[in-house]
Every structure is written in C-alpha cells, then in structure tokens.
C-alpha cells in the first residue's frame, strides 16, 4: 500500500541535528522517509544510513530514493535499529555526526488492517513490525501463561485491569484459540467493568499497545539502540528522539539525564574545574511539543515529544 505517513516534528527534529553537509548520519526509523528526505536535502558529500525492519517501508523508500542510493548518498539497511553498531560496522562506519529516531508504529502500519496493529480493523492477531520474526500477538495471547499476560498488560499498557483481562483471556482460550483483533477486543471489553468502559477512550487501546510492545520488544530494542547510539556519536554529534507514549519518553529522558550528569564525588575531594564533567549535554531541558497548527493538521501529533542530546 502507498505510504501516507505524515511526519511529526520533522523540522524541529532535523534542526536539533544541525546537519553538516559532509557528515555521516543515521535515520534509525526510516518509515515513510520523511526524516531521510529532509536530511538528504542538506547533505552534499555526506552519507545517510537509514534503518527499518518493515518490508513495506524498505520497498517504498528503495523506489523513492533510487537515485540517492545509486549515488552512494543513501544506504538503506533492512534491520532492527538495535543492531546499529554491527550493521554500520559492515559499511566501515564507527562514528556518526547525528542520529534521528521517530518511534512507535507508522500510520501505514497502523492503518493497514491486515497487520493486526489496530483494534479498529478485524484481522489476524499479528502486530509484527518485522514480518520475518516468528513471535506474533496471536502466540502471546494464546500461549503465554497468566502471570506473563498480567505483567505485559500492567507494564507495557499501564492497564488498570491487567488481572481481569489476563484471566478473561485465559478462560476464552481454554475453549478455542483467540485468532483475531475483534475477538480480543470483545474479550477485553468483557473483562473491564462497565463504568470504566465508558470513559478514557477505546477500552482496548492500552491492551493493544501492551501486546504490540511485547511482540516487538520495543523498549528493550530502544534501550539497546540508544546505548549504542550514544557511543557511536562523534565529538559534537547529536541525537534527536521523537516519542509518542510515556514509557518510551521516560526511558529516553532517563538515559539522556544519566549521560549528561556529572558523576557524584565525595565532598572535599580536590578536583580541577572540568575534570569530572559529563561527556554529553542535553539539547532540550524540556521536551519540544508540536505546535497547535501541527496538531490541528495531524491528530496523532498530540502526544509527540522531542528530546535531544549532544556529545561534547
């Protein structure tokens, strides 16, 4: 299907990177190619390495940017961004000037009813960002034990009723496998008390987020990738990260804060000024949010937050 993904905070995210025309850059989440296209406009002799694990994104951008690929200006890497260091090493790259992340599910993945990401479309329970992997939402819902289901719903969905939903799933799958998104939606609705169903948006929203994060190990992959990204940065290199939900934002905020904080030293220890300064500095003391105008155009922008960090 054609890509119709509207990139959120596009110019703000790229502005934080302060692109050098001759630099080496990474788009960790190629998606619809919005950030990739913007970076390419600003490169002259530089090179951009763009990662994605989604077949559709890879095929679409390979066609869109065929000339840039042929010229060696763009390299598309069909891998999860948690392989950042090893994948770039395959191209002889050991340091980069900037990395951009645009996290979460792309509009194309979400709106493709057959991918099973959305509670709005009836489809097989899939939710894989990388169609090559074996684990699907169907496997988790039908095979993972009660305690694991409860942990996933509580931790990744911050669900108010994880025990009730996990128990209801367990009861239903004893009779027959749970195969589709709508079957799961009905089970979740059945598990949640009626007063709670009537407020706070769609009752299955948090549960679907939880299973999607579990299927793709999104938080684990992000932590792995950011750890590598921070080490890959050259002097004056920068990272900008756009998040769309609190779990991701909390992780990014915590990692950036730790890296940009000087180590705590015993009182009275004789040290020279600057001797124990942090190697990184925050580019955003508070996250950047979309403008009112952008949110009016794209309702999915409402929860977006942009954070940045620089290596000194």
UniProtKB/Swiss-Prot annotation:
Pfam (any one): Methyltransf_5
Entry EC number(s) = 2.1.1.199
* Compartment annotation: Cytoplasm
Could you tell me the keywords of this UniProt record? Answer: Cytoplasm, Methyltransferase, rRNA processing, S-adenosyl-L-methionine, Transferase
List GO terms (cellular component aspect).
Answer: cytoplasm
Q: Which domain of life is it from?
A: Bacteria
- MF-aspect GO terms: rRNA (cytosine-N4-)-methyltransferase activity
Q: Which PANTHER family match?
A: 12S RRNA N4-METHYLCYTIDINE METHYLTRANSFERASE, S-ADENOSYL-METHYLTRANSFERASE MRAW
Q: Which family does it belong to?
A: Belongs to the methyltransferase superfamily. RsmH family.
Q: What is this protein called?
A: Ribosomal RNA small subunit methyltransferase H
What species is this protein from? Leuconostoc mesenteroides subsp. mesenteroides (strain ATCC 8293 / DSM 20343 / BCRC 11652 / CCM 1803 / JCM 6124 / NCDO 523 / NBRC 100496 / NCIMB 8023 / NCTC 12954 / NRRL B-1118 / 37Y)
Its lineage opens with:
Bacteria, Bacillati, Bacillota, Bacilli, Lactobacillales
């Amino acid at each position: 299907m054609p890509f119709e993904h509207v990139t959120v905070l596009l110019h703000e995210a790229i502005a934080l990177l302060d692109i050098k025309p001759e630099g080496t850059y990474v788009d960790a989440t190629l998606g619809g190619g919005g950030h990739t296209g913007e970076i390419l406009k600003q490169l002259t002799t530089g090179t951009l390495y763009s990662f994605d694990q989604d077949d559709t994104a890879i095929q679409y951008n390979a066609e869109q940017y065929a000339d840039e690929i042929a010229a060696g200006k763009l390299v598309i890497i069909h891998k999860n961004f948690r392989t950042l260091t090893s994948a770039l090493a395959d191209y002889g790259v050991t340091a980069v000037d900037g990395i951009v992340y645009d996290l979460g599910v792309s509009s194309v993945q979400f709106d493709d009813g057959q991918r099973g990401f959305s509670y709005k479309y009836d489809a097989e329970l899939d939710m894989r960002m990388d169609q090559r992997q074996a684990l699907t939402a169907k496997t988790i819902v039908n095979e993972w034990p009660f305690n694991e289901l409860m942990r996933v719903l509580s931790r990744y969905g911050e669900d108010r009723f994880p025990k009730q939903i996990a128990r209801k799933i367990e009861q239903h799958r004893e009779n027959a496998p749970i195969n589709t998104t709508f079957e799961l939606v009905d089970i979740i609705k059945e598990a949640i008390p009626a007063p709670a169903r009537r407020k706070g948006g769609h009752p299955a929203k948090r549960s679907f987020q939880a299973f999607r994060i579990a299927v793709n190990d999104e938080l684990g992959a992000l932590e792995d990738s950011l750890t590598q990204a921070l080490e890959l940065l050259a002097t004056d290199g920068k990272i900008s990260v756009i998040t769309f939900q609190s779990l991701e934002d909390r992780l990014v905020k915590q990692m950036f804060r730790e890296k940009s904080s000087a180590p705590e030293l015993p009182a009275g220890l004789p040290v020279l000024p600057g001797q124990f300064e942090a190697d990184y500095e925050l580019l955003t003391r508070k996250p950047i949010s979309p403008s009112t105008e952008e949110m009016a155009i794209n309702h999915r922008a409402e929860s977006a937050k942009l954070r940045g960090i620089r290596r000194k």
